[in-house]
Swiss-Prot record:
Residues 1-26 are annotated as: Disordered. GO terms for cellular component: Golgi apparatus; kinetochore; MIS12/MIND type complex; nucleoplasm; nucleus; spindle pole. The keyword Cell division applies. This is Polyamine-modulated factor 1. Its main location: nucleus. One of its GO terms (molecular function) is transcription coactivator activity. Induction: By polyamine analogs in M1 myeloid leukemia cells. Keywords: Activator, Cell cycle, Cell division, Centromere, Chromosome, Chromosome partition, Coiled coil, Kinetochore, Mitosis, Nucleus, Transcription, Transcription regulation. GO terms for biological process: attachment of spindle microtubules to kinetochore; cell division; chromosome segregation. It is found in: Nucleus; Chromosome, Centromere, Kinetochore. Residues 153-194 form a coiled coil. The keyword Acyltransferase does not apply. InterPro entries: PMF1/Nnf1 (IPR007128).
Length: 202
């Protein structure tokens, strides 16, 4: 754990070992670069002082027989190990979309600084915290639903007015049909009366 802590501190100082004070106060290190710096620092620890000595202790007899070959094996082993670790970390970053997530986090933090408002902190009362977070959401949902209800009510009223207008038109047509029917019946009676008069003997 102590080595991890030192690695993080070294990464924050940067690849050249510069301290955070060397960075301007208004500048922040992107978390993607910070992650890369931590990885670089970790990989540098693999070839730190005495790492070769620790390696040779595992193959002491072989090292005594041929130290040059041991050195080449060590160099190749370290290079392949570093490459493998970098590839694994790259795959993890791609699978988890870490670059986009970290950039989004940087953007959120930067926007929070620009607002100048104090960051939200829990009050210690779960009910109060839940209400403070959920109440605005539910109020917004309520406004949206009310707007939809008013819109639907207006649409329903338009449909009701159209139905009433259609009914009035049907009633008017029925009245016209009855009037035409009465007129036709009256005309038919007159024709019958006229025919009966014409057929009557003189």
């Amino acid at each position: 754990m102590a080595e991890v802590s030192r690695d993080s501190e070294a990464a924050e100082r940067g690849p050249e070992g510069s301290s955070p004070e060397a960075v301007p106060g208004d500048a922040t290190i992107p978390r993607v670069k910070l992650l890369d710096a931590i990885v670089d620092t970790f990989l540098q620890k693999l070839v730190a002082d005495r790492s070769y000595e620790r390696f040779t202790t595992c193959y002491k007899h072989f090292h005594q027989l041929n130290p040059e070959v041991t050195q080449r094996i060590y160099d190749k082993f370290v290079a392949q190990l570093q490459t493998s670790i970098r590839e694994e970390i790259s795959e993890i970053k791609e699978e988890g979309n870490l670059e986009a997530v970290l950039n989004s986090l940087d953007k959120i933090i930067e926007e929070g600084r620009e607002r100048g408002e104090p960051a939200w902190r829990p009050s210690g009362i779960p009910e109060k915290d839940l209400c403070s977070v959920m109440a605005p959401y539910f109020l917004k949902q309520q406004d949206t639903l009310c707007h939809q209800v008013r819109k639907q009510e207006a649409k329903n009223q338009e449909l009701a007015d159209a139905v009433l207008a259609g009914r009035r038109q049907v009633e008017e047509l029925q009245q016209q049909v009855r009037a035409l029917q009465q007129t036709w019946q009256a005309l038919h009676r007159e024709q019958r009366e006229l025919l009966s008069v014409l057929r009557a003997p003189e």
